[in-house]
């Protein structure tokens, strides 16, 4: 995780962000990881489309940590999928709760797994 000042410098390179509101309700907690993996793959497709539309610095922040690989190496240096791996917003010092609330989206800490999740991904656009 980079220091906050490095995160600020990174975000200063972007003028806009698109917030993706993703909802889900899992019957079993272990279903969250494959669900998240599939959502992340779809979000990468969106990022690529925006890139091909001329926004060459488009960058997606997944709704949680990168879960693209079934077995993560745990470090960027050893990652076997560096081209597609992306951080979650919290790893770049984004306060997701405050950010999404400021634009009217719902978010709360869930008390049980039978509650619907409100998850958020962010597409940064230059």
Regions found by a protein language model. Give the residues of each.
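Catalytic cores of enzyme domains
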Residues: 1-126
